[in-house]
């Protein structure tokens, strides 16, 4: 099974949607909250090239945010990850 890291904040609606989508597909993930840690948000920029949340990494590779996760679902990739 793949390792999924999900960088989120408490106030982010797209973060909630990303979590729900992963759970719907039975994909476990590690949630890393970045709301109260400016230094960690800077590290997020280094990891992904983006400041926005959610940011999702699959096996250490940044895939983007919620829109990119939905696109992977549309293409059937999420079901392959769970196999």
Across the structure, where does each feature detected by a protein language model lie?
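Local sequence-structure signature of Cys/Sec-based thiol-disulfide redox active-site neighborhoods
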Residues: 1-28
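Short alpha-helical
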Residues: 13, 39, 64
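Residues at alpha-helix termini
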Residues: 25, 47-48
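Thiol-based oxidoreductase modules, predominantly thioredoxin-like and allied folds used
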Residues: 28-41
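A general structural signal for well-ordered alpha-helical segments in protein cores
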Residues: 41, 50-53, 75
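Structural micro-motif
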Residues: 48-57, 67
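Non-catalytic, surface beta->alpha helical segment in thiol-disulfide oxidoreductase systems
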Residues: 58-83
């Amino acid at each position: 099974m793949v390792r999924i890291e999900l960088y989120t904040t408490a106030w982010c609606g797209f973060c909630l949607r990303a979590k729900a989508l992963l759970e719907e597909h039975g994909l476990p993930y590690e949630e890393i909250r970045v709301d109260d840690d400016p230094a960690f948000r800077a590290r997020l920029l280094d990891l992904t090239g983006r400041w926005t949340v959610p940011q999702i990494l699959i096996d250490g590779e940044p895939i983007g945010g919620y829109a990119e996760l939905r696109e992977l679902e549309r293409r059937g990739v999420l079901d392959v990850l769970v196999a």
